[in-house]
Amino acid sequence: MNKIQAKAPDPIPFGKEAFSPQAGTTVRWLGGAGALVNCRGTNILIDPVLEGFDMPLLVESPLQVEDVPQADAILLTHSDNDHFSRDTCRDLAPVCGAYHAPRYVAGLCRD
């Protein structure tokens, strides 16, 4: 029996334009478990792992930290390495209005 590694399609790269005000709501896949939700210019990053991943990735991140002009909030669901990156949290802090996470994950962000 042959075993194969399933691989998701490569995410579509995007940059600062994805954060602009718009008429509706757009959800963009960040690769892995993450997403960017832009609802009429309110931008929420969910489980962004844009850097600091501790193993090779099967797909490249479609967004770089330096291309995030602002985020109204970052939601961190839990601390598994495909949902949480200290490096990403640290580097997005200057452009992020608020972080929301369970108490344990919030403590990791402060470390």
Feature roles, as predicted:
Residues 2-23, 101-111:
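Metallo-beta-lactamase
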Residues 13-19, 36-79, 86-91, 101:
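Pre-active-site segment of Zn-dependent metallo-hydrolases
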Residues 23, 31-33:
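Residue-level marker for the onset of beta-strands and adjacent loop->beta junctions
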Residues 24-26, 94-99:
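Short active-site oxyanion
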Residues 29-31, 40:
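Short loop/turn positions at the edges of beta-strands in beta-sheet-rich folds
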Residues 30, 99-102:
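Active-site-adjacent beta-strand anchor residues
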Residues 33, 80, 105:
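A generic "binding-loop/recognition-motif" signal
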Residues 83, 91, 107-111:
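Phosphate- and divalent-cation-binding pockets in alpha/beta enzyme and binding domains
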